[in-house]
């Protein structure tokens, strides 16, 4: 027995003893309160359990009634009978658990409250009455004068009696305190033990009951799986027949890529202020965590986490020096951006570094995966960036026509692409799709930190690739782009970093090359160049600068260079517009963008046409497709219209470019825009009798309607658009339904 109060201190009646008594009384009072609360909660639990049992039994009866609905089905009847019988046995076990819990509460807790604590309180009252009597006797004995001997003798005798009575009661009370302390421990632990034993018995019985159905459940699961497959197959066949009757032309199916999530651990956590995306732009403080290749936050510990970035490989982070608040940085993903604020400059830098490191780590882990993935966790979103979206709902699946190994081999086979564009490391497995270059993993992480407005990074081995994007990468390449961005490296005597250089050296080089653009061939001041009115629509593009771009003979990059005015007399926007014309010149377009051309530059001399509209009218469909893909990758607005109210989708429809129409629809082209004559793209397609484009536009409208109703839509939409994309890339002339007299529309 653990002695809480010492009997010697009890006889001394020291202040320490009195304080100990008061402390124990407070503890016992609190114990009594909590035990009464526990009893109340236990009674509530028992009452809820009985209600649960009653509701569960009624629920089982409802399940049994399903077996008698409609024609007899032996399989369903057997299933319901076995499972309801098992559930009934489990409820019987639950009732036994409630009875055991009630018995334990009454035996242990209620007995302790009513008997143990009651006797303790009575002993306490006797003790304090004795203490009061002793205090009174001591006071009276002390107040008797010397001259009153008789009274002093009586007071002394009374004091002895009071002291003896107090000490006896004090010893009894001390014993009672020590006993109640031990009894409390024993009774509570015994209560918990009996409760756990009852729970163990209950769950053991449930386990045994369900184990008897293990084999049956396994067999039933297999049968149900087969039924679901058959039903899904029948449903899909009916939907395909339905679309076939309406459209009469459908492409074949492609296997859906598998999804796999890579491992990840906790990187950093802490409080940050987050700006809301509503109209009020309010700021709230949340607990942010970088873990499992995700950026998440929560308000309280028990709150569910909110995912800001589902896959860090799809995002970039940048500082926000122009924000009204200090210490702000922004995490940008393809679908949204999140403005965050830390408490100090140092914390802001730490968070930015942590996000960048997490991005690099995510890519490194994916690179070490022995099993190449056609579409990983988040790479489906990467595919969306190339496959774009179809209306408000968007396309949700990408396609990889030739496999990841085929894409990497095809892109790396281009002259100069077998090495990293920036550090010359062999066998690069990453690419910047808006620049058209290949990168090593370290340089790709640096490119990603620049932001998507400078470089859009994608893996050659992990992500899905649309066919038009693969062809675009093969038409550009490291040699062409480096002739633009490194034009003055030799003249400036600047040393290019190698594979063994540090990350800091590579980062400084990449920043100077793509952000500061130190090595570009300088153009005259913009005000000295012409840019308000562009050349006629059919004028050939401006040829590349001598010595700046040297394309390979026989490729899309080496078009004939007809005589033209000096490039230096053109505004970069006008140069981009000219280069997007007949036929398009991707190197010249890249040169114009490098010199700051606005990808949505408007040519006032040609009905406010944009480079994207100009590229749509190229003579060769494949050239036009790749030029449009290049402009879209660099931020071209797919819905910007000319003076006649016609956007790129209108022009593609007028010219019968089915591949371009498919590309613009995937990139979110607005189907409802009408030109100055009140015609939308579908009206034009019907008037020109272009069945392919009519099919695409009607499917897109159906997709929009499904998305507006919250429906996922039929996978047939995706199949058709993937097939048109592949056909537009492999055999574009087959899809072209243009005729020369359509220009009069």
Curated annotation (Swiss-Prot):
Residues 1-382 are annotated as: Required for formation of endosomal tubules when overexpressed with PIP5K1C. The keyword Zinc-finger applies. It holds the Pfam family PH. Phosphorylation at Ser-555 by PKB is required for interaction with ITGB1, export of ITGB1 from recycling endosomes to the cell surface and ITGB1-dependent cell migration. The modification 3'-nitrotyrosine is found at residue 485. The keyword Heme does not apply. SMART domains: ANK, ArfGap, PH. ANK repeats lie at residues 607-640, 644-673, 677-707. GO terms for biological process: signal transduction. The modification Phosphoserine is found at residue 555. Its main location: membrane. Residues 537-546 have a biased composition (Pro residues). Residues 405-745 are annotated as: Required for interaction with GULP1. It comes from the Eukaryota. PROSITE patterns: ANK_REP_REGION, ANK_REPEAT, ARFGAP, PH_DOMAIN. PH domain binds phospholipids including phosphatidic acid, phosphatidylinositol 3-phosphate, phosphatidylinositol 3,5-bisphosphate (PIP2) and phosphatidylinositol 3,4,5-trisphosphate (PIP3). May mediate ACAP1-binding to PIP2 or PIP3 containing membranes. Only one PH domain of one ACAP1 dimer inserts into the membrane, while the other PH domain acts primaryly to interact with adjacent ACAP1 dimers. This is Arf-GAP with coiled-coil, ANK repeat and PH domain-containing protein 1. The lineage of its organism: Eukaryota, Metazoa, Chordata, Craniata, Vertebrata.
């Amino acid at each position: 027995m653990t002695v809480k109060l010492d009997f010697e201190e009890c006889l001394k009646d020291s202040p320490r003893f009195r304080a100990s008594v008061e402390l124990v009384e407070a503890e016992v009072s609190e114990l009594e309160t909590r035990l009464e609360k526990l009893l109340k909660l236990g009674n509530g639990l028992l009452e809820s359990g009985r209600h649960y049992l009653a509701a569960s039994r009624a629920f089982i009866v409802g399940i049994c009634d399903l077996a008698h609905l409609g024609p007899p089905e032996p399989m369903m009847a057997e299933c319901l009978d076995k499972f309801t019988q098992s559930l009934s046995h489990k409820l019987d076990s639950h009732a036994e658990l409630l009875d055991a819990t009630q018995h334990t509460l009454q035996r242990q807790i209620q007995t302790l409250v009513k008997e143990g604590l009651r006797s303790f309180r009575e002993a306490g009252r006797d003790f304090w009455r004795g203490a009061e009597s002793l205090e009174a006797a001591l006071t009276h004995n002390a107040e008797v004068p010397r001259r009153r001997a008789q009274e002093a003798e009586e007071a002394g005798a009374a004091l002895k009696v009071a002291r003896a009575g107090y000490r006896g009661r004090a010893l009894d009370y001390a014993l009672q305190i020590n006993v109640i302390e031990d009894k409390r421990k024993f009774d509570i632990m015994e209560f918990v033990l009996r409760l756990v034993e009852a729970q163990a018995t209950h769950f053991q019985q449930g386990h045994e009951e369900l184990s008897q159905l293990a084999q049956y459940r396994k067999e039933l699961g297999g049968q149900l799986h087969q039924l679901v497959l058959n039903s899904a197959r029948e449903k899909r066949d009916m939907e395909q027949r339905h679309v076939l009757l309406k459209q009469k032309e459908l492409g074949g199916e492609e296997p859906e890529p598998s999804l796999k999530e890579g491992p990840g651990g906790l990187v950093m956590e802490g409080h940050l202020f987050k700006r809301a995306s509503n109209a009020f732009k309010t700021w709230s403080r949340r607990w942010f965590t970088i873990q499992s290749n995700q950026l998440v936050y929560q308000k309280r510990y028990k709150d569910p986490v909110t995912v800001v970035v589902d896959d860090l490989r799809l995002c970039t982070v940048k500082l926000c020096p122009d924000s009204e608040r200090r210490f702000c940085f922004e995490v940008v993903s393809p679908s949204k951006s999140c403005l965050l604020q830390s408490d100090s400059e140092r914390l802001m830098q730490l968070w930015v570094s942590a996000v960048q490191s997490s991005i690099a780590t995510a890519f490194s882990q994916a690179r070490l995966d022995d099993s190449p993935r056609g579409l990983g966790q988040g790479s489906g979103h990467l595919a969306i960036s190339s496959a774009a979206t179809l209306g408000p709902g968007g396309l949700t699946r990408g396609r990889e026509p030739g496999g990841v190994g085929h894409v990497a081999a095809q892109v790396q086979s281009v002259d100069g692409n077998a090495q990293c564009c920036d550090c010359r490391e062999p066998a690069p497995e990453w690419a910047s799709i808006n620049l058209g270059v290949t990168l090593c993993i370290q340089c790709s992480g640096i490119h990603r930190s620049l932001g998507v407005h400078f470089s859009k990074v994608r893996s050659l081995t992990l992500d899905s690739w649309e066919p038009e994007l693969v062809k675009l990468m093969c038409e550009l390449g490291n040699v062409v782009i480096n002739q633009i961005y490194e034009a003055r490296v030799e003249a400036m005597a600047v040393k290019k970093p190698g594979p063994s250089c540090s990350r800091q050296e590579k980062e400084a080089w990449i920043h100077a090359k793509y952000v500061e653009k130190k090595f570009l061939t300088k153009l005259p001041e913009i005000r000295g160049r012409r840019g308000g009115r562009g050349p006629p629509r059919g004028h050939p593009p401006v040829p590349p600068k001598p010595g700046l771009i040297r394309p390979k003979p026989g490729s899309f990059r080496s078009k004939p260079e007809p005589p033209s005015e000096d490039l230096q007399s053109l505004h970069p926007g006008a140069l981009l517009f000219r280069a997007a014309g007949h036929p398009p010149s991707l190197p010249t377009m890249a040169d114009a963008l490098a010199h700051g051309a606005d990808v949505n530059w408007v040519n006032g001399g040609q009905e406010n046409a944009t480079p994207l509209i100009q590229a749509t009218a190229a003579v060769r469909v494949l050239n036009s497709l790749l030029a449009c893909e290049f402009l879209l990758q660099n931020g071209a607005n797919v819905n910007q219209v000319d003076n006649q109210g016609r956007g790129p989708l209108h022009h593609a429809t007028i010219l019968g470019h089915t591949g371009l129409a498919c590309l613009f629809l995937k990139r979110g082209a607005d189907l409802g825009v009408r030109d100055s004559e009140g015609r939308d793209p579908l009206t034009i397609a019907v008037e020109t009798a272009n069945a392919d484009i009519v099919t695409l536009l009607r499917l897109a409208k159906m997709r929009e309607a499904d998305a507006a109703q919250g429906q996922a839509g039929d996978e047939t939409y995706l199949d058709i658009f993937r097939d048109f994309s592949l056909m537009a890339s492999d055999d574009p002339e087959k899809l072209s339904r243009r005729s020369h007299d359509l220009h009069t529309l």
